[in-house]
């Protein structure tokens, strides 16, 4: 079974979600920012791939009510939060969603990351989102712990083995997260 089949199977095993909060590593802002688009457009925020990839769309719907609940939850833990009225879904959001929910039947609320916010802010954001999971929200974090396409392509096209840092970093990270 390939990874896309595993993702689809896992999605089918989840209970029906009221809305999906998708946190993509490809939307990085200073403050947590919540997308409010009624029909978030599919963003093709990449280059150098086969033309067919640029034709793919994910016809998601948004939910202003769900987005407002996310804003309220973030405010409740003392974090400032921004609203993005027209934010679309970047490839870190729509690609996994397209595999998990191909019919786009569940409303989607995009949420940005803050790569310079530090661990305390990330922890607070997690505290804000946790109660929403108990209210029918599915919270999905998307992205790899390493993302160097140059090294990946070099290895994939016969240019050598996967670099050691790519093989070692996930274990290093897991050890620290579980400590």
Question: Where are the predicted features?
Answer:
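A charged helix-plus-loop insertion that forms the helical arch/lid used to bind
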Residues: 35-59
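Surface-exposed, charge/polar-rich loops and edge strands
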Residues: 69, 76, 106-107, 115-117, ...
